[in-house]
């Protein structure tokens, strides 16, 4: 009978221990490390946390807790809602979630104490001469606490917004600079591969630039003592004077004026192209031509009469 009761008690203890297991409670604690240093108690610690003998539990987990030994925390950690406990404790499972993810960290704090010796007692034989500074280091204090986990977000830039690696350094060939009403001229110093100077308003989409002076055709000016005819007849193709003489069979009783063709002044030619002014016909040259024609006619008549 006693053996039956002992077996039943052992089974009850085992079942109670399994009921407090994190796997049976559906608790996701993460990586746990088993520790057997605490007076023969088998407890679990979160991964990365070490424990001293002074911090070990003295008994098993109470009702409603599991065998995961926790340092104090003030935010939900590993599914534990015992946030107000300032000592090591067993995990009290819950379905709560922290506002931000946290992880355990171990910090070590050391204190340094500085002492200054001004004088020594008479009994001190090896007293240093003058002030002496002695540094005393207090043993370090280790604290385990949760810290928030900062997630890193990578900022991506669309490929369509990327800029070209290099900018073309070459420019188009030269473009003749033109001005309204003038003959297109060649810019001084222009050549293949040079940047053209574009006159404002000559083509859309070009940048204005100052163009050098364009050489124009010479403009003929009218002399002050000559008149400008209304029209100018084109010069004939034949430049040799042609004299028309009367028939030798008939002898006129009275000298008649022969028909004389008036030629244009010598040296006149095709007008210049481009920006030019129509040159006038020289009145004096026409009169000289008429006089020459009259003298030639009179000479012919005199030869016939002789």
Swiss-Prot record:
Residues 224-257 are annotated as: Disordered. Residues 1-16 form the signal peptide. It comes from the Eukaryota. Disruption phenotype: Blocks the adhesion of conidia to onion or celery epidermis. The GPI-anchor is attached to the protein in the endoplasmic reticulum and serves to target the protein to the cell surface. There, the glucosamine-inositol phospholipid moiety is cleaved off and the GPI-modified mannoprotein is covalently attached via its lipidless GPI glycan remnant to the 1,6-beta-glucan of the outer cell wall layer. Sequence repeats lie at residues 166-173, 174-181, 182-189. One of its GO terms (cellular component) is plasma membrane. Induction: Expression is induced in bean root exudates and water. Cell surface adhesion protein that plays a key role in virulence by allowing adherence to plant roots surface in order to colonize the roots. A lipid is attached at residue 283 (GPI-anchor amidated alanine). This is Adhesion cell surface protein MAD2. Residues 284-306 form a propeptide. It comes from Metarhizium anisopliae (Entomophthora anisopliae). Belongs to the RBT5 family. It is found in: Secreted, Cell wall; Cell membrane. Keywords: Cell membrane, Cell wall, Glycoprotein, GPI-anchor, Lipoprotein, Membrane, Repeat, Secreted, Signal. It is a lipid-anchor; GPI-anchor. Glycans are attached at residues 225, 275. The tandem repeats might be heavily glycosylated to produce a rigid elongated structure that holds the adhesive N-terminal domain at the cell surface. Residues 239-257 have a biased composition (Low complexity).
